Amino acid sequence: MTEKPTYLTREGRARLEAELEHLMTVERKQIAERIAAAKELGDISESGEYEDAKKAQALLEGRIRELKHLLSRAEIIDEDQASTGEVRIGSSVTVRFEDDGSEETWTIVGSAEANPRQGRISNESPIGAALLGKRVRNKVTVHTPSGVMKLTILKVR
C-alpha cells in the first residue's frame, strides 16, 4: 500500500527541515553531553540524571524519525494552483457561519502544518475536508465532534 503524501507549503517544508537540522546537530549533542555527565557521576543503575537523559534521547530520536518520514513523503503545494477559485490545499478561504453571521478565514494545509490558532487547518479535518473542491457562494454543511456547522464560502484565494 502506498503511503499518502504529506502536503506542505514551501515555508512548512523549510520549517521542518530547520527543526530536523537543529535536532540532529544541537539537541543530539546536548543530550549526549548529559548522558556522559551522568555516567561520570558513577553508578548509573540508580541515576535519575542518566534515566532522564536516556528518556530525552528516546523522545528526540523519535521526533527525528518522524520528521525524516514526513519529509520523505513531502509533496509541495503549488500555491499558483491554489488560486483557481476552487478550494484546494494551499487556498485561503473566508467563510460565514450561518448560525451567527460571523466570518473566519483559514488556509487549508496538510496535517503536518495545521495550526488552528494561526488559521491553518488540515485538509483532513472535518472543516478542511468539507471545503475542498468547493467555490465561492457554495454552502457547506460540516459534521464536527461538537455538532453540525453550516458555512457559506465568501472568498477563495
Swiss-Prot record:
The answer on whether this UniProt entry bears the keyword DNA damage reads no
The organism of origin for this protein:
Chloroflexus aggregans (strain MD-66 / DSM 9485)
Name of the molecule in the record: Transcription elongation factor GreA
Question: What PANTHER family is this protein classified in?
Answer: TRANSCRIPTION ELONGATION FACTOR GREA (PTHR30437:SF4)
Q: Which cysteines are joined by disulfide bonds?
A: none
What biological process terms from GO does the record include? Answer: DNA-templated transcription elongation; regulation of DNA-templated transcription elongation
Keywords, sorted A to Z: Coiled coil, DNA-binding, Transcription, Transcription regulation
The residues forming a coiled coil are 47-75
Which family does the record claim for this protein? Answer: Belongs to the GreA/GreB family.
Its Gene Ontology molecular function terms? DNA binding; RNA polymerase binding
A Pfam short name: GreA_GreB_N
Q: What does this protein do?
A: Necessary for efficient RNA polymerase transcription elongation past template-encoded arresting sites. The arresting sites in DNA have the property of trapping a certain fraction of elongating RNA polymerases that pass through, resulting in locked ternary complexes. Cleavage of the nascent transcript by cleavage factors such as GreA or GreB allows the resumption of elongation from the new 3'terminus. GreA releases sequences of 2 to 3 nucleotides.
Q: Which InterPro entries match?
A: GreA/GreB_C_sf (IPR036953), Tscrpt_elong_fac_GreA (IPR006359), Tscrpt_elong_fac_GreA/B (IPR028624), Tscrpt_elong_fac_GreA/B_C (IPR001437), Tscrpt_elong_fac_GreA/B_fam (IPR023459), Tscrpt_elong_fac_GreA/B_N (IPR022691), Tscrpt_elong_fac_GreA/B_N_sf (IPR036805)
- Output the superkingdom of the source species: Bacteria
Q: Does the keyword Iron-sulfur apply?
A: no
Gene3D superfamilies, per the entry: Transcription elongation factor, GreA/GreB, C-terminal domain (3.10.50.30), Transcription elongation factor, GreA/GreB, N-terminal domain (1.10.287.180)
